[in-house]
Every structure is written in structure tokens, then in C-alpha cells.
Amino acid sequence: MAIRIVGVDLPQNKRGEIALTYVYGIGRSSSAKILDKAGVDRDVKVKDWTDDQAAKIREIIGAEYKVEGDLRSEVQLNIKRLMDIGCYRGVRHRIGLPVRGQSTKNNARTRKGRKKTVANKKKATK
């Protein structure tokens, strides 16, 4: 039986600590804290969890963590707020350039997209 937490099916054959990282907003350290609080051993595979353990984990995540859709929308709203107030970071987001001070002379292709080739100017003939 697949265990579903906040709309994400956890992989059955992985350790609990790793499986919880499939949820957006939960990393290794958060998953370790959640499992410790729920009283579940980190090394137990997901398929070996009892229904009570899964329910306890769901309860902890629901009460203490902002994950999946809520977190994604909060991040989007934060970026939109930066763009609306017109600060440097917001402007960089708006024009699609790196936000954190990286150089853009040669690289930054991930943020800028594919290279746009510009034709050379033809030399004047005598």
C-alpha cells in the first residue's frame, strides 16, 4: 500500500529519511527532525511503517511545516512582491538575469536561455 503524504506518494523501498525528501519543502535535516518527533526510526523503509506512524508523520508535517503548494505559492508571491516594488532583485527577476550578483559577460545561460546569435557587420569594400 502506497503511503501518501501531502499529495505525494512516497517510494516504498527507500528509507524514511530519504523518502520524505520527495515532498517539496522537506530536506534531509527536516525529515530527520520529523521522524525523531514521530518516534520512527530513520532507517526503517517506508513499506514497514505502520498506519499509526504514517498518521503521526502526516500530523507533524501538517501542523509545523509549509510544504508543496502552499510553499510554492509563497515563494512566487515573494518574487512578485520584489518585482512590484521595483528593487534591484525584482528588476533582475523581471528581465530574466541572475539575481545574486553573478557575472553575465560570458555565462549565465541557465537564466538567460539559449544563445541568440547576432550577425556580424559587413566590412565596407573599397
UniProtKB/Swiss-Prot annotation:
Record note on quaternary structure: Part of the 30S ribosomal subunit. Forms a loose heterodimer with protein S19. Forms two bridges to the 50S subunit in the 70S ribosome.
| One Pfam family matching this protein | Ribosomal_S13
So what does this one do?
Located at the top of the head of the 30S subunit, it contacts several helices of the 16S rRNA. In the 70S ribosome it contacts the 23S rRNA (bridge B1a) and protein L5 of the 50S subunit (bridge B1b), connecting the 2 subunits; these bridges are implicated in subunit movement. Contacts the tRNAs in the A and P-sites.
> Region (Disordered) spans which residues?
98-126
Q: What is this protein called?
A: Small ribosomal subunit protein uS13
Q: Which SUPFAM superfamilies match?
A: S13-like H2TH domain
| GO terms assigned for molecular function | rRNA binding; structural constituent of ribosome; tRNA binding
Q: What is the lineage of its organism?
A: Bacteria, Pseudomonadati, Bacteroidota, Bacteroidia, Bacteroidales
Q: Record's Gene3D superfamilies?
A: 1.10.8.50, 30s ribosomal protein s13, domain 2 (4.10.910.10)
